[in-house]
Amino acid sequence: MATGVLPVFAGRATKACDILPDHDKIYEAEFQLGLTSDTQDIYGKITEHREVGNITAENIENTLEKFRGDIMQIPPMYSAVMINGQRLYDLARQGVVVEREARPITVYTLELTAYDEKTHFGKLEISCSRGTYIRTLINDIGDALGCGAIMTKLVRTKACGFTLDDCVALEDLQELANAGISAEKYLYPIEKVFGDLKAIKLNPHQEHLYRNGIRLDID
């Protein structure tokens, strides 16, 4: 199960959800070679045990090169993707597997940060576009290595411009609430999400239109 950065919008800030900048995301992912599962991670049913052999860190590094940049990825069956009005995960739970079209994604960085050649356990740091399934990326890397692989842990370290240093654990918020202490210091202004964008000055007419939800075509 993924942990890490998850921005939560409250009050009037929720109005910005539909116009959020298309920020890229950064993940730290752990994997295990030699296994495959129906969900492509450790939480699913193990479907196959494979011989790993003498796969080295160098072998993995060479394979990762094929998965950097603009690539096509087939979404997993256990996902919220809709096909013919049905969620894939609903079909998967019924034991139904359907054809899925590959989708374009971008993997900006893909680095092997740790690998144990005895246990075949490793870690990756990944910066990617929205819509990228990390467990599928790991599954495909395992297939390319010829031994299979599953994701064992996933931490989102950056999303919507926020990092782990900006975050507070849900358990800590609950403790504050139980103690009657305000959590206001953990609230950020919505402007933080748009901080990387260039400012555009609107005239009064344009401002009126924008405040009423009308999209503006500004060159």
Describe the residue ranges of each PLM region.
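Accessory RNA 3′-end/elbow-binding domains used by RNA modification enzymes
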Residues: 3-5, 23, 58-63, 121, ...
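The conserved catalytic core of RNA pseudouridine synthases
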Residues: 7, 97-131, 135-146
